[in-house]
């Protein structure tokens, strides 16, 4: 079943992709004053003038057309991912909309800006210097805020809550052509309650996660209708569970490390059933096997064969004996 999120570079500290590294490329005269001809909103002339001076000294301001062309050519999937309007913050005092600004690192930012401390604050879009990743969302003092969309050029994305630049809280993660997960995250990984559609292995899972793996209780259903409901540990069936196979067979009991192991009950689609000990998906130990209600074997098993002491019950008769690999070698 595998770790749903280990196969993509999307899992990383998002803030490392979008950190302002200091000096920016100097703009040519006139660009800044043309784009900022009047102070927007309620910011004071003094604050605004200071911002213009810094931008003119340190920033390269690119045109809106160039910015949109980069997005349309490098991130064509951006518009297919709905961004919730409730997470677009309303500008407050000293926060205003800045045009596309290119840092010396090559990173590009367009969005809300704090004119007091000259840092990204509010809602904005940032494109990494190599144009491989884009962040659209909330900013706080030049760092990724509490909510946003982290999108890779190949279409992989995370949309949801962040904490200190990491995926944390509720979110949605899609690895194109491989899987889509919706649920809770912690430290960049699924952790808590969550649902995953695995397109590669053709299954859906709903349940508990820990550190990117299925841990706790859950329901796993494959496209062929094989279905498991029960306990998981490290992505494997482990504990008490029920598995229903596509042909109608059913097992209910204990699992260890992904295998049927321990006490359990198996019912075949033709009515036969077994109740007893299992080891590695095979009858091993003590158990009862019913051919029907009138005939059953009670005794010892080895690798799916009657082996050791046992009794065959047929109607009201009993036959005690010693068995060896499914055949009686001594009995009455």
Please state what every model-predicted region is:
Residues 1-332:
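Intrinsically disordered, low-complexity repeat tracts enriched in Gly/Pro/Ser/Thr and acidic residues
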